[in-house]
């Protein structure tokens, strides 16, 4: 299609959609506006770009979570290995945030760096399993309905002396919230 043809087709689609909305507008039951959605309100908040890795680690700092998805209100354990003597953890919720991509929801977490043991393969099954100690426990329990909304979160790990960074990625669900 030419540019003119695409514009014409788009115009007709919009016109038909408008006609259909006008025709059935009286019979459609009222629904909650998207602006009333907790997720929409959250994504309208200001974000930042500090969540982006500026010096990705090559095993200097790395970790994993006890689960990839948790229910809002649950606790989540982080298992972190670091060659740095101290690390910081900052938790970001991914979202629109005016195009910034994420918003800091919890920062200022300073932890001692721990060199965790290198995992080895099970000789029978070949399974490689980390048997690391818990470095930090994140608690998502809150009475504030605007905190720990469902979504994808990043725990950004940063070695304080090396500046090396990596992520632990997890999801928070809210099964009590109506879709």
Residue positions per predicted region:
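Extended, solvent-exposed regions of the mature portions of secreted/cell-surface glycoproteins
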Residues: 28-179
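N-terminal secretory signal peptides that target proteins for export/translocation
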Residues: 1-10
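Bacterial N-terminal signal peptides
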Residues: 11-26
